[in-house]
């Protein structure tokens, strides 16, 4: 087992780290406060190839591996959880789905624009009555001649208000349950498609989280991904990969808060000495550090298994479950270390704590991850 990154992976990490520190960190507090989507940085990331790291050069990608992509999400999330999830949702949930399940025509038409960052992508599965119960889809798709007509709505869609390419799941045969769900590529300009309510959120406030509305939305027949009835399987396999991205986001948030806490402990003085000299806080730091390292190994292992085309579903669930819990614990402890200052916006740890919470919820709640893990263990 090799715990060293390759030269290429190190280069990706260093490049993204420098970008995160120089371009993302300076505006992180401002975009959180104003809920402003950081389009200028998304465009810069596109030019640097950061929106297509794991995709083949044939389709405009960087030709990197899964771990390189995960390292990028981690580094971005150290300074801004919002920026991390923008990249993760675009890459893991939309572009990767088309790469894995799309046909050559669909890849040629859509994947290149996504991999180069010319267009942003989003993933539309969650509905008002179908969150964890993804099988309870109410959006329907009816085939009429050379097109499908979609009716329904999706909620809590990351990148919803800024994406141009969407993956939408809809029922093509309600009588078949999960086997009646199909997946479609929908463009924002398709007739009958619109963006609904924009959510106001506790954390990741600068990400565009919206409702998607389809009223007699016309989708060309050729935009069906795979075959009718295969959508549920496509969604579940895609979410397996997406969970590694969110685990990387959680890992990055935890690392960012940890670094802030360590720096503060070295400079903050109480009773005539730095608070880093107090054993109680030293033990807290030791626990935070150890849990971050444990989370890192789970996340990197899941990424490596995915890259090797080995079974990774349970490993992705473990990584997301643990990294999310660690992110919540570490950010909360970081706020505690800062004391009253940690509760103010003068320091970034309160934002990091707010950003961390969502990692326990989206792309499968922690409870769902436990079901996946337990199901495997008890099989």
Residue ranges of model-derived segments:
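Alpha-helical interface subdomain recognition
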Residues: 1-89, 101-106, 113-118, 131-134, ...
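Short Ser/Thr-interspersed hydrophobic loop/turn segments at strand-loop and sheet-helix junctions
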Residues: 49, 73-77, 170, 186-191, ...
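Short glycine/proline-enriched turns and hinge-like loops at secondary-structure junctions
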Residues: 64-65, 133-135, 159-164, 177-180, ...
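Short Gly/Pro-enriched turn/cap motifs at secondary-structure boundaries
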Residues: 87, 114, 129-132, 156-159, ...
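Flexible, glycine-rich active-site loops centered on histidine and acidic residues
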Residues: 95-101, 123, 135
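A short, Trp-centered hydrophobic/proline-enriched beta-strand micro-motif
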Residues: 117-125
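Flexible, small-/acidic-enriched active-site or ligand-binding loops
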Residues: 136, 189-220
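A short core secondary-structure module
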Residues: 146-147, 151-195
């Amino acid at each position: 087992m090799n715990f060293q990154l390759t030269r290429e992976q190190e280069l990706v990490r260093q490049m993204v780290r420098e970008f995160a520190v120089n371009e993302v960190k300076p505006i992180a507090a401002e975009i959180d406060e104003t809920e402003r989507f950081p389009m200028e940085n998304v465009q810069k990331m596109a030019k640097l190839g950061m929106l297509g790291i794991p995709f083949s050069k044939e389709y405009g990608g960087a030709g990197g591996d899964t771990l390189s992509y995960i390292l990028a999400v981690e580094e971005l999330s150290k300074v801004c959880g919002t920026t991390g999830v923008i990249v993760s949702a675009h890459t893991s949930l939309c572009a990767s789905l088309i790469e894995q399940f799309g046909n050559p025509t669909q890849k040629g038409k859509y994947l290149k624009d996504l991999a180069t960052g010319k267009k942003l992508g989003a993933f539309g599965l969650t509905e008002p009555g179908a969150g964890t119960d993804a099988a309870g889809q109410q959006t329907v798709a009816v085939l009429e001649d050379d097109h499908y007509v979609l009716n329904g709505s999706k909620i809590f869609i990351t990148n919803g208000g800024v994406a141009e390419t969407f993956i939408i799941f809809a029922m093509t045969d309600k009588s078949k349950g999960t086997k009646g769900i199909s997946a479609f590529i929908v463009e924002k300009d398709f007739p009958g498609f619109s963006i609904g309510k924009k959510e106001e959120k506790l954390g990741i406030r600068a990400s565009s989280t919206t409702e998607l509305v389809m009223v007699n939305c016309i989708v060309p027949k050729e935009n069906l991904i795979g075959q009718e009835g295969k959508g549920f399987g496509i969604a579940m396999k895609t979410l397996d990969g997406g969970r590694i991205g969110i685990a990387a986001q959680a890992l990055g948030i935890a690392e960012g808060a940890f670094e802030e806490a360590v720096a503060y402990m070295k400079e903050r003085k109480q009773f005539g000495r730095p608070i880093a000299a107090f054993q109680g806080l030293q033990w807290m730091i030791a626990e935070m550090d150890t849990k971050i390292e444990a989370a890192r190994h789970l996340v990197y292992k899941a990424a490596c298994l995915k890259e090797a085309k080995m079974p990774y579903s349970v490993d992705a669930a473990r990584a997301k479950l643990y990294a999310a819990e660690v992110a919540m614990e570490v950010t909360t402890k970081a706020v505690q270390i800062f004391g009253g200052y940690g509760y103010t916006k003068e320091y970034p740890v309160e934002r990091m704590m707010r950003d961390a919470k969502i990692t326990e919820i989206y792309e499968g709640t922690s409870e769902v991850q436990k079901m996946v893990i337990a199901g495997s263990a008890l099989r």
